Amino acid sequence: ANSNDDISLLYFTSGTTGEPKMVAHDFTYPLGHIITASYWHNLDEDSLHLTLADTGWGKAVWGKLYGQWIAGANVFVYDFEKFEPVDVLRMIHDYGITSFCAPPTVFRFLIREDMSKYNLSTLRYCTIAGEALNPSVYEEWLRLTGIKLMEGFGQTETTLTVATYPWLEPKPGSM
């Protein structure tokens, strides 16, 4: 790159309100995700973070890599062809995942499993994005794990825009 405003990567919007549009991000874009990782995901150098997001989705880099590495966290990357809830529970159990981010639908499927089969004691923080959170999913996850689901909102065009940070009390379904 010759300058910070050179194009670093291109993503396409989901096309929710029309045709997908190309979004260019420059080389300063990863810096915006220091907030994502350090405050929303609540990561530090002792963290092992897992985000479930397809690499074609902007969330893949802003939820898995940029801020997380800048914050010094360890990143667990899992590539799968088909989502299986037991695989996620097994990964948390086997690898000691400490921080986990996924769309609310993932948590809806996880709470349907027999979670008592897995030691999830290393998991200390969970974040969600990508769709609305059903308050009943929040309550059941909290009951089963003791962990609050912290919502966040961002877009392909931006970084994390608004979130429930560790010092805030969640209001399930408010985003």
Model features per residue range: what roles?
Residues 21-24, 74-81, 150:
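Short beta-strand->loop structural element characteristic of the AMP-binding/adenylate-forming
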Residues 70, 97-101, 111-172:
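Gly/Ser/Thr-rich phosphate-binding loop
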Residues 7, 13-16, 49, 92, ...:
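Conserved S/T- and glycine-rich ATP-binding loop of Class I adenylate-forming
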Residues 1-12, 19, 42-48:
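Conserved pre-ATP/AMP-binding loop-to-beta segment of ANL
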Residues 28, 105-108, 131-132:
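Alpha-helix/helix-capping structural signal
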Residues 31-48, 52-98, 113:
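Conserved AMP-binding/adenylation subdomain of ANL enzymes
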Residues 8-32:
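Conserved AMP-binding A3 loop
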Residues 2, 173-175:
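Short Gly/Pro-enriched turn/cap motifs at secondary-structure boundaries
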